[in-house]
Amino acid sequence: MAPWSHPSAQLQPVGGDAVSPALMVLLCLGLSLGPRTHVQAGNLSKATLWAEPGSVISRGNSVTIRCQGTLEAQEYRLVKEGSPEPWDTQNPLEPKNKARFSIPSMTEHHAGRYRCYYYSPAGWSEPSDPLELVVTGFYNKPTLSALPSPVVTSGENVTLQCGSRLRFDRFILTEEGDHKLSWTLDSQLTPSGQFQALFPVGPVTPSHRWMLRCYGSRRHILQVWSEPSDLLEIPVSGAADNLSPSQNKSDSGTASHLQDYAVENLIRMGMAGLILVVLGILIFQDWHSQRSPQAAAGR
């Protein structure tokens, strides 16, 4: 077997002349940079990152962080913002397009912003979108109330006041249920010495069930929240008043018509019963009148 030699050593121009030094340098640079450029141009899709059962976790509860890449992934890394080293490294789970990172007991040290990467033969992927992992239960709960009234008419707006005597830098309003929406506002100091935020919500409708809580947090660790406020449910009144006059007139007319129809049926049934009674009496009298002569003849 012939000994291996660099491909550039076998390149000779037509005519047998030696390759110029400048051309040799360019060829060597092209050969050395070629594979590297191919890897960089691979454009690996970025990883996908999420948390189960969710990204807002009560203090002491467990959470699982999942990172998804491609089937060619050989390694997954979880990186926490502000940390110089990877938070954790995991081998992929079958079928190799996912990895699992577990936190058995959530603390303030786990709260923060995370991203993940995966490694494949083509190189490292792009980072995932950030995941905000929040821990709750580190401060006393704020209060949540509706202004100007806890009962809201359908179609109106309502202002939700989240407040506390504690010096929170911001308040977070969250919606319970399937929607799980959230809003964040900086806190304001009131003349009474309370910190609060006013959240405008609406217009509200009876078709949407409004159940909300709020939290407080401080600026140095924004992902560490207080205990949740008591649940606030907003009753929406005036649903029947939203009917148009034509609808109300139509409904009342229909009800009146049904009532008249029922009375007519009762009268007809009464008349039919009376006729049956009269017929019964007439038949009995006829039968009795025919029997009397027969009885007299028998004597």
UniProtKB/Swiss-Prot annotation:
Residues 290-299 are cytoplasmic. Residues 42-268 are extracellular. Keywords: Cell membrane, Disulfide bond, Glycoprotein, Immunity, Immunoglobulin domain, Innate immunity, Membrane, Receptor, Repeat, Secreted, Signal, Transmembrane, Transmembrane helix. GO terms for biological process: cytokine-mediated signaling pathway; immune response-regulating signaling pathway; innate immune response; negative regulation of interleukin-12 production; negative regulation of interleukin-13 production; positive regulation of calcium ion transport; positive regulation of cell activation; positive regulation of inflammatory response. Residues 1-41 form the signal peptide. It comes from the Eukaryota. One of its GO terms (molecular function) is inhibitory MHC class I receptor activity. It is found in: Cell membrane. It is a single-pass type I membrane protein. The chain crosses the membrane at residues 269-289. This is Leukocyte immunoglobulin-like receptor subfamily A member 5. It comes from Homo sapiens. The lineage of its organism: Eukaryota, Metazoa, Chordata, Craniata, Vertebrata.
